[in-house]
A protein has these predicted regions:
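Residues that form or flank phosphate/diphosphate-binding pockets in enzymes
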Residues: 18, 80, 98
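Short strand-loop junctions, especially beta-strand C-caps/beta-turns
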Residues: 10-13, 88-93
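Short amphipathic alpha-helix that is part of the acyltransferase structural core
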Residues: 1-47
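Short loop/turn microsegments at loop-to-beta-strand junctions
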Residues: 57-58
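Conserved acetyl-CoA-binding loop-helix of GNAT-fold acetyltransferases
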Residues: 90, 95-107
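Short loop/turn motifs at secondary-structure junctions and domain boundaries
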Residues: 49-54
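Conserved beta-strand in the GNAT
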Residues: 61, 66-76, 82-89
Length: 107
């Protein structure tokens, strides 16, 4: 039995990739309604991240042994050289300190 966990970070640059749908499931199940950004708006910005005038947008999925277990959304504001972490969401089934801190450090 192999208990090794291999975490990988993958940047989302298109809403057409299969990982996007898994990430949105995790996002909608993990984030409270009042704090949620519309998934249509997230989809738009994933597909048009280069149009963000203030800096750079980043959308990531966390993979554990090639299974999508997390989603993160960040913005880098060039003028103030500030990195904002908007969301870090991890599937409840995989939610642990190991998964969270691995995701955080990979970002």
């Amino acid at each position: 039995m192999n208990n090794n966990v291999d975490y990988k970070l993958m940047r989302l640059t298109s809403s057409k990739c299969s990982e996007y749908f898994e990430a949105m499931k995790i996002y909608t199940q993990s984030v409270e309604y009042i704090q949620k950004t519309s998934t249509n708006e997230i989809k738009y910005w994933i597909d048009h991240f280069k149009k963000f005038a203030l800096g750079d947008l980043f959308f990531f999925v966390l993979l554990s042994n090639d299974i999508v277990i997390g989603y993160a959304e960040l913005a880098y504001i060039k003028k103030s050289r500030t990195l904002l972490i908007d969301y870090i969401a991890i599937d409840k089934q995989y939610n642990s300190n190991s998964a969270f801190y691995s995701f955080y450090w990979l970002i």
